[in-house]
């Protein structure tokens, strides 16, 4: 049976009611936040309650919705079922592994990583993994129909998704610190005036293991969790997308959708090969320097001077020529960028079109901010259009 390309839209994602967690990520500057906000707004049309969480320190969802958000869910203006929150720059303090179930306020101010600094050296990144664990434990307790994660650029996102494995290694490493744990608890007891037993500490560790296991299971359940990659048709973005796709496969996290943003489509439906200006005409346009546009637009009569019919005709010819040169320069830039994008669109099609929903989004004429524009962007995500790949150049005879 012949393989068929998957439909180029997010329609299937929007129509999957079992999805609870949708991560949106990619290289910085490709439109992750616009896409995640548009996805959340689109889901709000059919889901009972939707939450979008920004884990990106840049926190652009406030800019996208033109509304300030904090680290608690806030209703988005214009909706009755869409909420947003931004994990602030202190989230490692906010969500650090506090020993909050221990008996005193002084004890609660201690964290696992402050008690065992050696663990930070033995397992690099364990402090961030502990923060992610606490964050995801909070997320698991939230009663929203679906949660959309606007993630940080690729490297940070990969660390977040890999935290269950890292944390599991860290917890195994704890067994080698038994004597140090006992000493740390003695110090904590001396400071707090309480008697914290080793089994209290062990209970916290077991709870953390349970969180790690449940989050891993949720991450690896394609009916529960999926990842939407966002890229643009340029080298670095396509490279990072492939890196992200490979890592998601390694982590057994579903990824079935790739949004290709900022794509130039043929202008007015005209085929590219039929509207390319001749190279000789472009070269002559580059060489010409007509009179300044201001002079050509202002007739001498406006300055109290006389102009003969011959002078007027010459001025108008120069004005038309000046406009031609400007249009040719724009067209030259357009075709150059179309050709560059087409090469990477071809790569994207070859790599992903049979296993992923590849969704090309046209370059927008204005910044996508505010509910109305985000909803229009969401409609683009829901509709299908082919990748605008240029036909191969005719071979020379």
From Swiss-Prot:
Q: Which GO terms describe its molecular function?
A: ATP binding; ATP hydrolysis activity
Q: What class of enzyme is it?
A: hydrolase
- Which InterPro entries does the record associate with it? Anion-transp_ATPase-like_dom, ATPase_ArsA/GET3, ATPase_ArsA/GET3_euk, P-loop_NTPase
Going by the UniProt record, its keywords in alphabetical order are: ATP-binding, Cytoplasm, Endoplasmic reticulum, Hydrolase, Nucleotide-binding, Transport
A cellular component annotation (GO) from this entry = GET complex
Amino acids binding ATP: 27-34, 234, 261
EC number from the UniProt entry? 3.6.-.-
Q: What does this protein do?
A: ATPase required for the post-translational delivery of tail-anchored (TA) proteins to the endoplasmic reticulum. Recognizes and selectively binds the transmembrane domain of TA proteins in the cytosol. This complex then targets to the endoplasmic reticulum by membrane-bound receptors, where the tail-anchored protein is released for insertion. This process is regulated by ATP binding and hydrolysis. ATP binding drives the homodimer towards the closed dimer state, facilitating recognition of newly synthesized TA membrane proteins. ATP hydrolysis is required for insertion.
How it assembles, according to the record, is:
Homodimer.
| Name this protein carries in UniProt | ATPase ASNA1 homolog
Organism name: Toxoplasma gondii (strain ATCC 50861 / VEG)
């Amino acid at each position: 049976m012949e393989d068929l390309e998957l439909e180029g839209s997010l329609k299937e994602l929007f129509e999957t009611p079992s999805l609870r967690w949708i991560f949106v990520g990619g290289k910085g500057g490709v439109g992750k936040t616009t896409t995640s906000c548009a996805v959340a707004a689109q889901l709000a049309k059919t889901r009972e309650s939707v939450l979008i969480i920004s884990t990106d320190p840049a926190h652009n969802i406030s800019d996208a919705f033109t509304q300030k958000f904090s680290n608690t869910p806030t209703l988005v203006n214009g909706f009755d079922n869409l909420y947003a929150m931004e994990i602030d720059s202190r989230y490692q303090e906010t969500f650090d592994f506090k020993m909050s179930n221990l008996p005193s306020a002084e004890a609660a101010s201690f964290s696992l990583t402050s008690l065992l600094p050696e663990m930070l050296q033995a397992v690099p990144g364990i402090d961030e993994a502990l923060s992610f664990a606490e964050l995801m434990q909070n997320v698991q307790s939230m009663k929203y129909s679906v949660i959309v994660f606007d993630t940080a650029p690729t490297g940070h996102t990969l660390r977040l998704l890999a935290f269950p494995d890292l944390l599991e290694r860290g917890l195994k490493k704890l067994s080698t610190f038994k004597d140090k744990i006992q000493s740390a608890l003695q110090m904590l007891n001396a400071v707090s005036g309480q008697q914290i037993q080793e089994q209290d500490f062990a209970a916290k560790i077991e709870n953390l293991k349970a969180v790690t296991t449940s989050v891993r299971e949720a991450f690896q359940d394609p009916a529960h969790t999926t990842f939407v990659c966002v890229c643009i048709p340029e080298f670095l973005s396509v490279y990072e997308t492939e890196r992200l796709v490979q890592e998601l496969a390694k982590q057994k996290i579903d990824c079935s959708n790739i949004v290709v943003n900022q794509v130039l489509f043929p202008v007015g439906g005209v085929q590219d090969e039929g509207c390319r200006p001749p190279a000789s005409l472009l070269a002559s346009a580059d060489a010409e320097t007509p009179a300044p546009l201001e002079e050509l637009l202002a007739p001498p009569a406006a300055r109290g001077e006389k102009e003969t019919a011959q002078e007027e005709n010459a001025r108008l010819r120069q004005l038309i020529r000046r406009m031609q040169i400007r249009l040719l320069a724009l067209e030259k830039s357009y075709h150059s960028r179309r050709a560059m994008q087409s090469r990477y669109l071809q790569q994207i099609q070859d790599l992903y079109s049979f296993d992923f929903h590849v969704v090309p989004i046209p370059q927008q004429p204005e910044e996508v901010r505010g509910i109305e524009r985000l909803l229009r962007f969401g409609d683009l995500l829901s509709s299908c259009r082919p990748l605008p790949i240029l036909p191969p150049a005719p071979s020379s005879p």
